[in-house]
Amino acid sequence: MAIHDRDIPEENRRRLLQAGVGAAALGILPGAQFAATAQGTFDWKKFKGEKIEVFLTKSPRGDLLTKYHKEFEDLTGISVGSEMVPEQQQRQKAVIEFNSGNPSFDVIALSYHVQKRQFAKNNWLADLRPMINDKSLADPNLDFADFAKGGLFYAVEPDGRVNSLPFNLDPWVVYYNKELFAAKGLAFPKTFAEMLDAAAKLNDPSKGVSGFVARGLKNANVPVWSSFLLGYGGSFADDKGKLMTDSPEAIEAGKMYQTLLAKYGPQGVAGFNWNESQSLFLQGKAAMWLDGIGFAQPLEDPTKSRIVGKVGYGVMPAGPKQQVSALFADGEGVSAYTKKKGPAFFYIQWASNKANQTRMLQAAAGAPVRTSAYAAAQASSDFKAPKEWVECMLASAKIAQPGLPVIAPVTEFRDVFGVALTNMINGADPATEMKKATAEFQPVLDKSEKA
């Protein structure tokens, strides 16, 4: 799997700012190509007796890896110490530890949509190419041809560096309560207009039922708005880095967000993140919930959910211009500061191997980045995920585009526009808020790109 550099034109870097980068994510990879390595001696026991520290995000995927750490230890003889915390705390701690120059971890899970550009600009992750090209370090089954191109797009930098291995894809979908829809004689909406109509008809405050729920909490709420932005045909920025977040499309997306959450959402939704939204939905108190694909497991768990067997999995309805599923992704990287790069690289190869990817799908814990996992999981007698969920996942992946701009200050982007969106829930004018947020964030983006 030798990886070679290519010259990257400046326009490719600029395209990373645009929502339209989704086409590239599913097509040719910028900056790298993958070929087969020469065969050689690879031994999982090469680093027997070593110990590594792993820093994971609390999620069904993090739980899955932790559950099978003993398998990795038995396979390699490498001991694993791990810490797993909620994503916001994980992101904050990662910055603090990397800036210290002596992070406590050797391996880190990263959310590409938030940390990819930040980590790359600061050179916080080891370039994996030397190890990928070392026949004694690269598992012959690493097999980049098995990885979805959307995942590889996120893992490879425009200059050709490979800073991580992709682990999970997260296209956004609409979960819906089939029982509530059937009671009103409604079909799953195919368009934004039908989505608004369904939310209005299913909203019943007298019974404590909301027509729609999604993230209202600032920062966390931006992917909800961007899901609508993409359907309206909008972009985050043009090819020169000028924000387009005050465009007519962006404002219409803001209006859609405001109507669904303020008019048909639950009381207090401005403070909802995904976990509060999930809780409401699995109690049968929301007709629709827009979020990432990886929540089927708790929704179908009778110890947690009151709507087992009643959950519908719907592809994001089409906007006026196009039908798009906002795409996010996660990966695993090796700290540039660690002295245990070899053992750490062994860990991330194991984490993204075909067995773990298949387990992820079997547990309905996420959308594997390996294409072989889909056939393997469905052929297994252990496969318990709803067929409709898998079909929704695959259909969503076909229309996916990145749900956030690939920029270093993406957290600041989410903070600034997240406040604007929360203000809209509380009655503020969408056009005014989008223009204000755009004016506030443009200098931040300009400074970041010049740096």
Model-inferred region functions:
Residues 1-12, 22-28:
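N-terminal secretory signal peptides
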Residues 39-46, 112-171, 308-312, 381-384, ...:
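Hinge/lid segment of periplasmic solute-binding proteins
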Residues 45-47, 51, 79, 182, ...:
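Conserved C-terminal helix/tail region of periplasmic/extracytoplasmic solute-binding proteins
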Residues 48, 311-314, 362-419:
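Long, aromatic- and glycine/proline-rich binding clefts that accommodate carbohydrate-like moieties
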Residues 70-147, 179, 183-190, 287-288, ...:
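Extracytoplasmic "Venus flytrap"/periplasmic binding protein-like
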Residues 115-117, 223-227, 252-346:
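Extracytoplasmic/periplasmic substrate-binding proteins
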Residues 152-167, 172, 193-243, 286:
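Extracytoplasmic/periplasmic solute-binding protein
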Residues 198-205, 240-270:
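Glycine-centered hinge/linker elements that transmit conformational signals in sensory
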